[in-house]
């Protein structure tokens, strides 16, 4: 079958990066299996198993990367067991060591430990891209920290903020996601050697009941695979707890939540014509409507984020339905859910890198929309001006309310501009000229500490992240479609 007459995941053809696809590839998995078999043999030899020699370990090391896939595939057709098929294939390349490969271990030794190693690699890539997105948002927030815009609550005009301050809200949620990813990486533990039901009975037999040697084997394998020697789960059944998968996918789904919020805001702002995602010179927005500038990147972020957030249910149910020391109904579900969860998170961050690299702002539209609402926002200031000239605060409050209702009616029912300033200027109770009122309608005076908040957030929250991860700051992503 060719690639055109079989189903191929869109994550592979459209969305996920080559780096993340390799992390979850068969090649990475089976090379990791072989690295684990080398680590096991070396650790057992160090603890005194005389039937394992340095020559055998060296032979195993020689063939970690040149996997004879054809042999493994043919063997699996016969024995219907992927691990034993690869033990056999490895043994064909390493005849001296063939008899000691996988000694004392169960399938989960390579399967589960590899899953943990692969997920760590995936989390590290996600982390790097997340920091890259934060760097672009920081640059954007700094550039637009002083530009006033309308803030919305209930999607209704509320009070002014700044374009840059709004960007810090997007960034702050991603910082929360980064903290969660860091926590998962810091607490991730290898399964180690636990045997068929977690009791390490086979290793007690190998080492004649010497528990210290078994603990040393665990520590040695952990170190060789890049973990702290103490980073081995203390107890398990046959598998590591599937709660680990649920925790990790929840962390990835958190990224989906934050990115979906960003993308939704940008889609709404595009409708307001205040801001929009990058739009290529030759990009076509619609096959029927040539004028369309659809926010397809942000729409894709929302689509993939929705998928990722729903994917969390898979490891949640899997964890709850593992019977006793393990059941195999985790395997098929986990194989799909975890890999595609990582691919989805990767795809989302690729688009985020692309979008945040070129957000378009239309300052005149931003200001025009703000000025259309500012007379309402400034009503209290106008009232204070009038009180200073001898007006009655309570009477003025009621008159402002009536003027606001009338001006709002003109905007909504007549489709005419907001004339509240003219109404107040014409009302002798206020004693203010139009010029005096307009002079007070300076948007920058209504944004509070927004510019300073941006500066403080970048300096106190984002800059330490960038200083600690300089290699992650400058990243770019191109999209295939």
Regions found by a protein language model. Give the residues of each.
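Glycine-rich cofactor-pocket loops
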Residues: 142-164, 276-292, 325-332, 357-377
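Short beta-alpha connecting loops at secondary-structure transitions
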Residues: 21-25, 71-73, 283-303, 325-340, ...
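A helix-coil-helix interface module used to build multimeric assemblies
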Residues: 2-201, 207-222, 285-286, 296-300, ...
